[in-house]
Regions:
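Short amphipathic, positively biased membrane-proximal segments
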Residues: 1-128
Length: 128
């Protein structure tokens, strides 16, 4: 048994259940990015990047729908991991900007979600 499968077992959740939850999370986050890009860019000190945030919203919604609609969500979970890396690469340079505390909070949140995404993708692949 791997550490990841132990964590999931202790939490009382399976990898497919976690994938479904993360799929719904993608839909919610993507919807927020599509509807409230100015709020997000304002929080991060990234005004003027609303178009990019909307594009990321499309990515999140698409990935969420793919996870929820797939009989094999593992590849789509790896898509979430790639999206996490892109998000970190977009947000991290703003640590030196006007709102470093907000950016640090966003990066911590991204790291936590990325850890769940990796754990889920790995466990789904083991279960194939």
């Amino acid at each position: 048994m791997t550490k990841g499968s132990e964590l999931l077992r202790d939490a009382g959740i399976t990898a497919p259940e976690l994938a479904r939850g993360l799929g719904w999370f993608s839909l919610a986050l993507g919807t927020m990015e599509l509807l409230l890009p100015r709020t997000i860019t304002g929080f991060l000190g990234m005004r003027g990047r609303e178009g990019l945030v909307r594009l990321y919203g499309v990515r999140e919604v698409g990935t969420g729908l793919a996870i929820l609609g797939s009989s094999d969500p593992a590849p789509w979970m790896w898509g979430r991991v790639a999206g996490d890396a892109l998000d970190v690469a977009t947000v991290a340079p703003k640590l030196a900007g006007r709102k470093p505390g907000n950016v640090a909070l966003a990066l911590l949140t991204l790291a936590a979600v990325a850890a769940l995404d990796v754990l889920c993708a790995e466990e789904l692949e083991r279960g194939r």
